[in-house]
């Protein structure tokens, strides 16, 4: 089954459409690539990304929720702000991911075997405010953006002057969830 599709949005950035009505972004420099977010952990995202780039891939997670992070289990180098470690542990559970996906346009379009295994965030590297990633002629800077979750991060692709925010700013940003910091964190 085809779980993924993509769209080139700049010379350096490809949007990847993932199961569960979410997107990831592949950012390519001359030497390296960064994958921002990995979705619900359905299907072989790593193999799909390999069809888009042959460069080494580092994963940067905007936050630890089940629709953005469980696909990270497939990748060797993963950064997440560790303030979201507990959120990731609670959201990576297979049944929670199934329950979520069944509320999306992807409901019923996968088999249980298509879900990647549960994974600990113990191997994740701590993503900190101000960290800068050099991809070769292209740079990404991480910025703390707490609110949606305590560890939410935004990524500035400097040369493209593009800021990727994950769920920190969109028409459906949750600030009422038990793990959210609320409106006051945005003030």
PLM feature segments, named:
Residues 17-19, 63, 82, 146:
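Residues at the C-termini of beta-strands that transition into short coil/loop
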Residues 33, 40-41, 132, 139-187:
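Metallo-beta-lactamase
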